[in-house]
């Protein structure tokens, strides 16, 4: 079932390996089509779960890899990618918190680092030719290792289905736990899990309960709300319910607290980078709580023009992250702008979790620009309401002149 491809002198390839059906088939395919090159399997631990890593090395070696490198990226992923992204306010098309997108640059970077370490001359990924990830990975490779060849089997081989891949492995006596009846395509990390395919391909189908794996259905969530306290320093979550935690530990703690309340579910039809629309269901419990907490503090501390600028940064950042442009000058610039704005994003927030909702119900900050003395509707001693008259006259001056000009024209 494999096609003949002219060897280009590749001797050692680092493959982004998950142990799933696709990458299990890629290992023997590379050997057969790239002159029996050496395959180094690489797996990034970004918090997808210990169960996904059990037996991974043995599986890779059994498939024909000479080595398997499992790199723990969990803490770095949250600290250096998730925290800066949510601090920027980035949210794609108004709903998607970019869980999959944020993971791609750190995985690509670590894959390049392994390639340099073992002296590889090529990188390989198992992304399909229809998806965003091929662009994200290869864009990062281009920025970090333009000298390394990139191999994308899904754009080269003749196999088109799970059945084809299973038959390919069976012909070579390579064992796999995969079956032809897999319903959904899922991708998990510490921040979220995504679900695509199966019944979700028809937008008229409501997602069944079998789609969701991380969060409770909101209607089945507890009838009593739960309150969680978050402390924020410079746009980063530092404490949860009074306990100082590392970024990864804070996210895991919030996942465990928010998931039973059905927080963080979305069902969207998004515009893919490659031009088509796709439907995905995403579960992001802890990230949703973090996002709500940061926005609540921003309401207190950012003035109007700063808030408007942050929204512009967020919109640009969302597209850069989604499109795989993390390692670009513009992304670096936007992250610096976000970091500057986050200097005053300090304080404490209490978030109410109830039936799928995460609502900031209490907030305070030492940098707050909100003054109860000025904002009160009751009697106060600090604000002279007569001062508003001059401001209004100047604020509306352009409108006044425009109207006077129009009246002058009419009278002629």
Curated annotation (Swiss-Prot):
Q: Name one GO molecular function term.
A: argininosuccinate synthase activity
Key word Cytoplasm present: yes
Q: Which amino acids does the record list as binding ATP?
A: 16-24, 44, 126
User: Per its UniProt record, what PROSITE patterns does this chain match?
Assistant: ARGININOSUCCIN_SYN_1, ARGININOSUCCIN_SYN_2
Tell me if Oxidoreductase is a UniProt keyword of this record: no
Q: Name one GO cellular component term.
A: cytoplasm
- A Pfam match is Arginosuc_synth
Q: Where does L-aspartate bind?
A: 128, 132-133
Q: What is its EC number?
A: 6.3.4.5
Which reaction is the catalytic activity of this chain? Answer: L-citrulline + L-aspartate + ATP = 2-(N(omega)-L-arginino)succinate + AMP + diphosphate + H(+)
| Compartment annotation | Cytoplasm
> Keywords of this protein's UniProt record, alphabetized?
Amino-acid biosynthesis, Arginine biosynthesis, ATP-binding, Cytoplasm, Ligase, Nucleotide-binding
Q: Pathway, per UniProt?
A: Amino-acid biosynthesis; L-arginine biosynthesis; L-arginine from L-ornithine and carbamoyl phosphate: step 2/3
Tell me, which GO biological process terms does this entry list?
A: argininosuccinate metabolic process; L-arginine biosynthetic process; urea cycle
Any idea which positions bind L-citrulline? 96, 101, 132, 136, 185, 194, 270, 282
Q: How does it assemble?
A: Homotetramer.
Similarity-based family = Belongs to the argininosuccinate synthase family. Type 1 subfamily.
List the NCBIfam families hit by this protein, alphabetically: argG, PRK00509.1
Name the UniProt record assigns to this protein: Argininosuccinate synthase
